[in-house]
UniProtKB/Swiss-Prot annotation:
Keyword DNA-binding attached: yes
GO MF annotations in UniProt: DNA binding; structural constituent of chromatin
Name of the featured protein: Integration host factor subunit alpha
GO CC annotation, single: cytosol
NCBIfam families recorded: PRK00285.1
InterPro entries: Hist_DNA-bd, Histone-like_DNA-bd_CS, IHF-like_DNA-bd_dom_sf, IHF_alpha
UniProt family annotation: Belongs to the bacterial histone-like protein family.
HAMAP family: IHF_alpha
Keyword ATP-binding assigned: no
Coiled coil: none
Length: 104
């Protein structure tokens, strides 16, 4: 398993190479898409990218947690979190890739 992290710059480079836009235009396009995803989530809208994943905002209620160092209970305030649910197509691609590496 690799520990490579794909960055915005990496995505822009791929767009530049495969689409033929300049690097500046590619970076702007990647930024535009990511900003639109963020803005949709801030508005409380789900973002479904077919064959990839669904991002949703979920409300979490207040609950009692525990400080792992001291063991003291403390309230955890209510908040909104983003959830990521991988599409079955993505899950299958990852599984197939894993199986192919296991055979080597």
């Amino acid at each position: 398993m690799t520990s490579k992290t794909v960055t915005r710059a990496d995505l822009a480079s791929v767009v530049c190479r495969k689409v033929g836009l300049s690097h500046t235009e590619s970076a702007a396009l990647v930024e535009l898409v990511l900003n639109e995803i963020c803005n949709s989530l801030v508005r409380g809208e789900a973002v479904k990218l077919s064959s990839f994943a669904t991002f949703q905002v979920r409300n979490k209620n207040e609950r009692i947690g525990r400080n792992p160092k001291t063991g003291v209970e403390a309230p955890i305030s209510p908040r909104r979190v983003v959830t990521f649910k991988a599409a079955n197509v993505l899950k299958q691609r990852i599984l197939n890739s894993h199986r192919a590496r296991q055979k080597k």
